Amino acid sequence: MGQFIFVSFGLLVVLLSLSGAGAGFCCPLGWSSYDLYCYKVFKQQMNWTDAEKFCTEQHTGSHLVSFHSSEEADFVVNMTYPILKLDFVWIGLSNVWNQCNSEWSDGTKLDYKDWSGESECIASKTVENQWWTKSCSRTHYVVCKFQA
């Protein structure tokens, strides 16, 4: 009887870990998880406005990626570089110098910053935690994010 309970408990632990229930959330197929959020790199280049619209169409609550710590930015760099090599991805910031209270396109507060210049829209390098200002009409790759 004791062995049956032990085996049953072991199977339950395995099932919970495979289902994502142990972590409390599970991202859709093709999306990567970090700190209760889901992320996906898209190998398509588009301007900032089209990229933000594209992200909102990928999943409910999805927007261009926002960063709230250097660890989160490192996670995205580690996710994007193998796919895109040395390049830029749009992040969810635009027109930040025209606003008193800057926020990400997903509505969250701008509480982590890593600027490298000044312009209308912001792109992040795929090889380091560094943000670059770019004309919003330029085309770059897309990383979308939503809360799981």
Curated annotation (Swiss-Prot):
Please indicate which superkingdom the organism of origin belongs to: Eukaryota
Q: Name one GO cellular component term.
A: extracellular region
Covalent S-S links between cysteines: C27-C38, C55-C144, C121-C136
Keywords attached to this Swiss-Prot or TrEMBL record, sorted alphabetically, are:
Disulfide bond, Glycoprotein, Hemostasis impairing toxin, Secreted, Signal, Toxin
Give the residue range of the signal peptide. Answer: 1-23
Q: Which InterPro entries match?
A: C-type_lectin-like, C-type_lectin-like/link_sf, C-type_lectin/snaclec_domain, CTDL_fold
Q: Summarize subunit and interaction data from the UniProt record for this chain.
A: Heteromultimer; disulfide-linked.
What family is this? Belongs to the snaclec family.
Protein name, entry field: Snaclec stejaggregin-A subunit beta-2
- Species this chain originates from: Trimeresurus stejnegeri
